[in-house]
C-alpha cells in the first residue's frame, strides 16, 4: 500500500484539435474538496503513504469547500494542494497539468511543501508554435520553456516528464 490514485475531476474544457476527451467525458465536473480530503484521510489511516491526484487538467480544478464554520467557498487547485498537504499524507503527486494553466503559485507551493513531490508531468505536444496553434494548445514554445525554467529554478533536483506528438497533420520538421 504505497500509492493511491484519487480522482479530483472529470472532463475537460480545452478542446485540443486531436483530443476526444471533451466529447466523450464532457465538460469539467469537479469533486467537492471536502470529499477529496475525506478520502485521503481515510487512505492515510488505512496505511497508504502516497496519493496521486488525478484529472485531465488538474490546474483547472475549481471545487466547493466547506470550512469548519460551515461557510462554503470555491477553491482552486493550489488551495486544494494546501488542504491535501495538511492531511498528513507523506507524499503527494498530481497528473496532469496543462502548460497554459500551470501557475508559478503551484510551483512555489511544490518547492516549499515537503510532502509535495518535486515531480511534474507537463505535456509539450510540439516544439513548433505553428503546430501548437493548429493543435489548439494555449501556449507557445517560449512559454513552455519559461515554465520548465521556473520549475528547475525552484526545484533543481526535480523530475519533469512530458508528452510529444510526432507527425501531427501539417508538420514538416
What are these regions (language model features)?
Residues 1-18, 41-45, 49-52:
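N-terminal pre-triad scaffold of radical SAM enzymes
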Residues 7, 31, 135, 139:
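Short, surface-exposed alpha-helical recognition segments that flank or form part
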Residues 9-10, 22, 56, 97:
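Fold-independent oxyanion-binding glycine-rich loops
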Residues 19-35, 63:
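Iron-sulfur (Fe-S) cluster-binding segments and ferredoxin-like electron-carrier domains
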Residues 30, 170-173:
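Ordered, soluble secondary-structure elements with a strong preference for glycine-centered loop motifs
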Residues 45-171:
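Conserved SAM/AdoMet-binding glycine-rich loop
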Amino acid at each position: 500500500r504505497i500509492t493511491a490514485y484519487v480522482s479530483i475531476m472529470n472532463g475537460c474544457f480545452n478542446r485540443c484539435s486531436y483530443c476526444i476527451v471533451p466529447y466523450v467525458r464532457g465538460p469539467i465536473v469537479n469533486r467537492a474538496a471536502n470529499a477529496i480530503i475525506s478520502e485521503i484521510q481515510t487512505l492515510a489511516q488505512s496505511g497508504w503513504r502516497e496519493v496521486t491526484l488525478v484529472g485531465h487538467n488538474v490546474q483547472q480544478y475549481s471545487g466547493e469547500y466547506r470550512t469548519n464554520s460551515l461557510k462554503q467557498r470555491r477553491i482552486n487547485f493550489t488551495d486544494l494542494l494546501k488542504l491535501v498537504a495538511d492531511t498528513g499524507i507523506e507524499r503527494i503527486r498530481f497528473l496532469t497539468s496543462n502548460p497554459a494553466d500551470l501557475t508559478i503559485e503551484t510551483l512555489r507551493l511544490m518547492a516549499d511543501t515537503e510532502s509535495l513531490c518535486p515531480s511534474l508531468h507537463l505535456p509539450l505536444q510540439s516544439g513548433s508554435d505553428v503546430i501548437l496553434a493548429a493543435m489548439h494548445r494555449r501556449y507557445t514554445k517560449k512559454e513552455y520553456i519559461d515554465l520548465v525554467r521556473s520549475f528547475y529554478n525552484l526545484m533543481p533536483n526535480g523530475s519533469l516528464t512530458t508528452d510529444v506528438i510526432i507527425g501531427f497533420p501539417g508538420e514538416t520538421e
